[in-house]
């Protein structure tokens, strides 16, 4: 896809701060530090539109980015390893659930899992939750460049089995730009 414009629009700490639903939205979800922000930057061919960090839990709000004035990319806070108080973690969970459950313009959820590990219980729980609410979901295995060539298919098969997928997850590496087009082709159902 040709990107003509990509801009940060708004951060939301509560549902009443979400933009008025008007154009399709694609949400990016996954555990803390799995590469959500990196994937968004890669898809948009930008280095710093979405802030990335090696520190888990950096994204603490729901961030909306308008793409080509046609749709939003929505960067959700990560779950799992963030070193935050449990009350903050529960607040994030309620915020994410409210967004995923109620957002009428949500067209797809990109669930990003770390290709180096089997999916976590939280990855499985989110996938089950999305299936229950009949939300379209696209599974992307991140950090594929961190695996040896011989490990890639084994890890992808494990992710497919653990998440009960019909098809193999798409691969992403911030170092290899060739895989972006395949992800783009699957973003808008």
Regions found by a protein language model. Name each.
Residues 1-83:
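Conserved G1/Walker A P-loop phosphate-binding module
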Residues 3-16, 146-189:
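Canonical P-loop GTPase G-domain recognition
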Residues 43-47, 100, 163, 187:
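Hydrophobic aliphatic residues
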Residues 58, 71, 78-81, 116-118, ...:
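Conserved nucleotide-binding/hydrolysis micro-motifs of P-loop NTPases
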Residues 65, 142, 183:
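Residue-level signal for inorganic ion chemistry
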Residues 68-107:
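Conserved nucleotide-sensing/catalytic segment adjacent to the nucleotide-binding pocket
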Residues 89-93, 120, 177-180:
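Amphipathic alpha-helical transducer elements in NTP-driven molecular machines
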Residues 94-167:
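Conserved C-terminal guanine-recognition region of P-loop GTPase G domains, centered on the G4
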């Amino acid at each position: 896809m040709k990107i003509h414009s990509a801009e940060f629009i708004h951060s939301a700490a509560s549902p009443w701060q979400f933009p008025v639903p008007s154009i399709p939205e694609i949400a990016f979800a996954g555990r803390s530090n799995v590469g959500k922000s990196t994937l968004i930057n890669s898809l948009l061919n930008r280095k710093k539109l979405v802030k990335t960090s090696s520190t888990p839990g950096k994204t603490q709000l729901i961030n909306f980015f308008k793409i080509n004035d046609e749709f939003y990319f929505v960067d959700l806070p990560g779950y799992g390893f963030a070193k935050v108080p449990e009350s903050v973690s529960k607040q994030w969970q309620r915020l994410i659930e409210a967004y995923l459950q109620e957002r009428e313009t949500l067209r797809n959820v990109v669930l990003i899992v770390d290709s180096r590990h089997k999916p976590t219980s939280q990855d499985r729980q989110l996938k089950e939750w999305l299936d229950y609410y009949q939300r379209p979901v696209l599974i992307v295995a991140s950090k594929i460049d961190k695996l040896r060539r011989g490990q890639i298919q084994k890890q992808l098969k494990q992710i497919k089995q653990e998440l009960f997928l019909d098809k193999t997850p798409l691969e992403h590496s911030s170092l290899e730009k060739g895989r972006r087009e395949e992800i783009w082709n699957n973003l808008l159902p």
